[in-house]
Amino acid sequence: MKKGIIGKKIGMTQIFTEDGTRVPVTVIQAGPCVVTQKKTASIDGYSAVQVGFDSTPAANASKPMLGHCTKSGQGVFRYLREFKFDAASEMNLGDVLTVEQFTAGDFVDVTGTSIGKGFQGVIKRYNFRGGRASHGSRFHRAPGSIGASATPSRVFKNKKMPGQLGNTQVTMQCLQVIRVDADDNLLLIKGAIPGHRNNIVLIKNSVKA
């Protein structure tokens, strides 16, 4: 059965297993999330559920968002995301998704927005080797030639060049759930996940596990 929930990255810490092994983990505040919309194959072309996370005052929401969220009867939410569940047809508006759907030992995929680094050169962006640092060298951190002048007289698509680094959607696959704290809605996942603290992430069961 497919699982999914919206969460917020709290930070990283470390825990110790019974045999004394130190395990680095990322702490995620996962849910609770509320089903705000059901999508069906007959109407929308696919089956999915839209869930809301992080309640916000109604005064902060636009009128379209206010009207959309009030259908669930659970208030207004700051973040809305979709999940394609096998049991989407069995869910109803207002149903609550909690962290209890996961158990320790599960493998999940975590999708988030990576930390933005701004405009960077090819050495930082693509790990280019760079030029010599010795006396007389005129080539240090430049990318070098990007194409010939006669043929093909253009720069090929996807040429590695300076540009924006980070601030893109990244998915980390097959991360193991170490601990589930249902009382505080916390997930402890082994290793690092994309983004800075308070970054919104999507947690789904792994497609490769």
From Swiss-Prot:
Chain segments annotated as coiled-coil in the UniProt record: none
InterPro entries named in the record: Ribosomal_uL3, Ribosomal_uL3_bac/org-type, Ribosomal_uL3_CS, Transl_B-barrel_sf
Biological-process GO terms, alphabetical: translation
Pfam families named among the record's database cross-references: Ribosomal_L3
HAMAP family (alphabetical): Ribosomal_uL3_B
Functional note: One of the primary rRNA binding proteins, it binds directly near the 3'-end of the 23S rRNA, where it nucleates assembly of the 50S subunit.
Family: Belongs to the universal ribosomal protein uL3 family.
Name of this protein: Large ribosomal subunit protein uL3
Species of provenance: Pelobacter propionicus (strain DSM 2379 / NBRC 103807 / OttBd1)
